[in-house]
A protein has these predicted regions:
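A contiguous pocket-lining binding segment that forms or flanks enzyme active sites
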Residues: 156
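Regulatory input/activation interfaces that engage signals or partners
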Residues: 5, 12-24, 28, 32-138, ...
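Basic, alpha-helical nucleic-acid-binding regions used in initiation and control of genome expression
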Residues: 2-5, 184-185
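Signal-transducing coiled-coil/dimerization helices and immediately adjacent hinge/linker segments
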Residues: 173-185
Length: 185
């Protein structure tokens, strides 16, 4: 996929993003938002996580096949989330709206306990998140992984994700402010 410099790609983004905007406050918001991202950059196993400061994380939405659910979600919630560089970043005054795992882990991911005890078994080779800060210090992350057969994000793909980060982060925040979402989370 190309950067959003070509008019047809930009047009697709506008159309897909409009679908997500129309779905704000409904159950179809996260699927529509992920569809918009996928229209720009290939992503695998998208997951939306709510991080509370004093509670374990909660998966709000995912597109993980059944065979990978245990390694992607269940094992994560058993405790490795505390070592997750994304979780730690999210709970410590994050400044950016997008992060890439290799950059957050400062190139030391494969030497970490988190990698040995959890991440190495997930079957993913790269990951990036869109981060949205909510009131009260809570955070929602849209996690986007890459499987080995698709390779890590290229610099151009990550640059494209970077361009998408502001509107996506803001939309997630606005979605969280809708009554139906707030009442159930």
């Amino acid at each position: 996929m190309h950067l959003m410099t070509d008019i047809s790609q930009f047009s697709k983004w506008n159309k897909d993003l409009s679908g997500a905007i129309a779905a704000l406050g409904t159950e179809s918001f996260f699927p529509k938002l992920i569809e918009a991202v996928r229209g720009q950059v290939r992503i695998d196993y998208p997951q939306v996580w709510l991080y509370h400061r004093d509670l374990p994380p909660r998966v709000l939405y995912h597109e993980i096949p059944q065979h990978a659910l245990e390694s992607q979600v269940d094992q994560y919630l058993e405790g490795p989330y505390r070592e997750d560089p994304f979780y730690q970043t999210s709970m410590n005054q994050p400044r950016a709206k997008i992060y890439r795992l290799s950059r957050v882990a400062l190139g030391e991911l494969k030497d970490s306990t988190y990698y040995r005890d959890y991440y190495g078994d997930t079957g993913t080779c790269d990951e990036a998140i869109f981060l949205s800060k909510l009131d009260g210090g809570n955070v929602i992350n849209l996690s986007m992984m890459r499987l080995p057969e698709h390779g890590p994000f290229t610099d151009a793909e990550y640059e494209n994700l970077y361009l998408l980060a502001e509107p996506i982060s803001e939309l997630i925040k606005r979605h969280s402010e809708h009554q139906e979402f707030a009442a159930s989370n």
